[in-house]
């Protein structure tokens, strides 16, 4: 892996990736490719990006030794990369800053985005408020219900949130509507895609902006643990937090890369969102990758306790890493993620996002099978404030209420 150089000039990761879009968008994508090629190594652009990460986001995010959890589980030591401590509460802000800086240089005053868990929407709304840009966020109506705190955050930040009622009313459908908007308003609009999917150059560009996560880990782990981890673990929906931490480690062949998908009610139940574990190659949202589809190539509905993992595809670089055997992908069920959520709360005083809880859950499974002198690095991609209502409801917490807009109490 020392010579890993992906994607190629046409945006392909092996047989995955590429650009499968309406003719209307070809010019916009060519324009974006040219702008990214021009600015990615531009000293002024790089300096501004790094300054925003340091002074607006609060990077570098720390690595934390989950010592009590590690002792209770036995085996490997578990370390957490604390992306939950970033401004806005997740890794998403790393990417939105990079793309917003590009949008400004390209003269695009209007920004659109899709969101599932709401974190990418909040991050996009945040940076648009900072830069004085118009912001429209598309969100599946089911996700609007289960992520209402983030919906209100977006409103507070000045964004217009558009609920999407088509299809499964989740992330896939929000992305469809965002693409339709972009086709209609391509001249003045920049589409900030939140994950490492979509047509080229998005998978590469989002990966590059997120790779600050892994680059920091390469410096921090020797200080924290004396050496690099034996395995890096991250949840995978579209896969941006995972690629952000995986990419700098790809060349370190002694480090396992483990992506954790949403197994929902179980991989055999048909109610999950594990496209790498149970899908097949196809084309969706402008790129070729692993998809959950039927025999006729129709996308099937997905399920996950976590809105951010509830997507029938995955970034094409993950598909490539799976095929070449550099990364491995496993599934964690809703119940396992919920147990991990509670355990991290009780043992370490950290409330994780349900997305991140999938990665924590797999670390809890893997650690006891390893030696105490080995280590696992988990990307804690976001905080769980947004999921409190969902967790309380699923846990049967009768006492949990939230105030309505009229000051009344509304049972969740």
Swiss-Prot record:
Keywords: Amino-acid biosynthesis, Aromatic amino acid biosynthesis, Lyase, Pyridoxal phosphate, Tryptophan biosynthesis. Its EC number is 4.2.1.20. It catalyses: (1S,2R)-1-C-(indol-3-yl)glycerol 3-phosphate + L-serine = D-glyceraldehyde 3-phosphate + L-tryptophan + H2O. Pathway: Amino-acid biosynthesis; L-tryptophan biosynthesis; L-tryptophan from chorismate: step 5/5. It is an enzyme of class 4 (lyase). Its cofactor is pyridoxal 5'-phosphate. The modification N6-(pyridoxal phosphate)lysine is found at residue 92. GO terms for cellular component: cytoplasm. The keyword Amino-acid biosynthesis applies. InterPro entries: Trp_synth_b_CS (IPR006653), Trp_synth_beta (IPR006654), Trp_synth_beta/beta-like (IPR023026), TrpB-like_PALP (IPR001926), TrpB-like_PALP_sf (IPR036052). GO terms for molecular function: tryptophan synthase activity. Pfam families: PALP (PF00291). Tetramer of two alpha and two beta chains. Belongs to the TrpB family. This is Tryptophan synthase beta chain. It comes from Methylibium petroleiphilum (strain ATCC BAA-1232 / LMG 22953 / PM1). The lineage of its organism: Bacteria, Pseudomonadati, Pseudomonadota, Betaproteobacteria, Burkholderiales.
């Amino acid at each position: 892996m020392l010579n890993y150089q992906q994607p190629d000039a046409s945006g392909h990761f092996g047989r995955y990736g590429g650009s499968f879009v309406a003719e209307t968008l070809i010019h916009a994508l060519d324009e974006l490719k040219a702008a990214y090629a021009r600015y990615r190594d531009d000293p002024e652009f790089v300096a501004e990006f790094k300054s925003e990460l340091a002074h607006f986001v609060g990077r570098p995010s720390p690595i934390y030794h989950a010592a009590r959890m590690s002792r209770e589980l036995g085996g490997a030591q578990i370390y957490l990369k604390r992306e939950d401590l970033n401004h806005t509460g997740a890794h998403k802000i790393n990417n939105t800053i990079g793309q917003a800086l590009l949008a400004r240089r390209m003269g695009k005053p209007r920004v659109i985005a899709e969101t599932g868990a709401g974190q990418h929407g909040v991050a996009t709304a945040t940076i648009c408020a900072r830069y004085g840009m118009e912001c429209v966020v598309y969100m599946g109506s089911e996700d609007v219900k289960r992520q209402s705190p983030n919906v209100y955050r977006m409103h507070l930040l000045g964004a217009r949130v558009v609920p999407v009622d088509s299809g499964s009313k989740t992330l896939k459908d929000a992305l469809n509507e965002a693409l339709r908007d972009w086709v209609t308003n391509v001249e003045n609009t920049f589409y900030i895609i939140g994950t490492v999917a979509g047509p080229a150059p998005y998978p590469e560009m989002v990966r590059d902006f997120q790779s600050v996560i892994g680059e920091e880990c390469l410096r921090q782990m020797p200080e924290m643990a004396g050496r690099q981890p034996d395995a890096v673990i991250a949840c995978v929906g579209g896969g941006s937090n995972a690629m952000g931490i995986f990419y700098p480690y790809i060349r370190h062949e002694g480090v396992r890369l483990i992506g954790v998908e949403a197994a929902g009610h179980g991989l055999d139940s048909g109610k999950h969102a594990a496209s790498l574990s149970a899908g097949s190659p196809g084309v969706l949202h402008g790129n070729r990758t692993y998809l959950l589809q039927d025999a006729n190539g129709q996308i099937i509905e997905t399920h996950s306790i976590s809105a951010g993992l509830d997507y029938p595809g995955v970034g094409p670089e993950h598909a490539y890493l799976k095929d070449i055997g550099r990364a491995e992908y496993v599934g964690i069920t809703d119940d396992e993620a919920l147990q991990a959520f509670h355990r991290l709360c009780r043992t370490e005083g950290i409330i994780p996002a349900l997305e991140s809880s999938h990665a924590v859950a797999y670390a809890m499974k893997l650690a006891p099978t390893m030696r105490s002198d080995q280590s696992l690095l988990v990307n804690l991609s976001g905080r769980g404030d947004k999921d409190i209502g969902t967790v309380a409801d699923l846990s049967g917490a009768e006492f949990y209420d939230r105030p309505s807009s009229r000051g009344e109490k509304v049972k969740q």
